[in-house]
């Protein structure tokens, strides 16, 4: 996000020194977070590295300004497709990672744990679809449309015309949490707007 913000402001103000700063940040970002398996570490703290596959990395592939090249972005999109994508959004943690808990049920502390350990978040799908479009262009349109259809049934199930906060990370992907969540609706609408730019 810092890299994207620096480049955005540099373009806005015409400040090349900000671009130079962004380029330095980009090199540091890649050296620190890109691992040999082609995806981004979730966090690095000194010598401690979290190899969990989480959706935070999708932002680096989706933003207009990114230190990643196309091949690196594709690696991120591909691992998100394989391990995080559900019909209801991106899981907050891969099922292959330790501590995976896909079910947002039980007392508050249990739900709070599951929230970041495997539930599917619809709003993250917007950034995933944006990154997918940037990699696969026109061939992505049908794939994205099929995924969006999965949200239509939700708009009559919980709160009419809206989408729940989260979904269980495993089938049958039950809607949980708040029955209406503005970020989810906003990202679906933003995705439709992105598709419209392809005259779709």
Regions found by a protein language model. Name each.
Residues 1-97, 101-103, 146, 153-185:
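Catalytic cores of carbohydrate-active enzymes
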Residues 4-11, 62-65, 127-134, 190-194:
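Short glycine/serine- and small hydrophobic-enriched flexible loop segments
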Residues 14-17, 137, 193, 199:
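Short, flexible coil/linker elements and helix-boundary hinge sites characteristic
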Residues 99-140, 189-193:
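C-terminal substrate/ligand-recognition segments
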Residues 131-157:
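C-terminal hydrophobic structural anchor segments
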Residues 182-200:
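Terminal, non-catalytic domain-edge segments
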